[in-house]
């Protein structure tokens, strides 16, 4: 009898540990993808008279996209996650103490695998609202002195 009472609670806890572990993994992957994009964006090609950025903003986005694809990050519908202008941004600023570039991933959707139904029960939301949105932002010093061309 005690097992019948405690088993559903135990299974819910195990499912929560698995789901939140996967959520944490995806957050780490997204952060690493942004970091790889910033590293690629910060590199400079020496042209003798000044350093120019090696990669265009589109190429930086492709570096981040390739990292996400290789890690197997998926959209909530199970398809590959495709970065758009709403989810990816890359910009730079000259602060006087150097040029800094920032790579941002925002509103990357994640759907819990085992607990979406339980999440709806406890929160009163419908399945369309089950998404959790992850963000990652990295700012890094640029090696170049001449900004990239779009």
What positions do the PLM features span?
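Alpha-helical assembly-interface signal, strongest on the long, hydrophobic N-terminal helix that forms
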Residues: 1-68
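Short, conserved structural patches
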Residues: 40-150
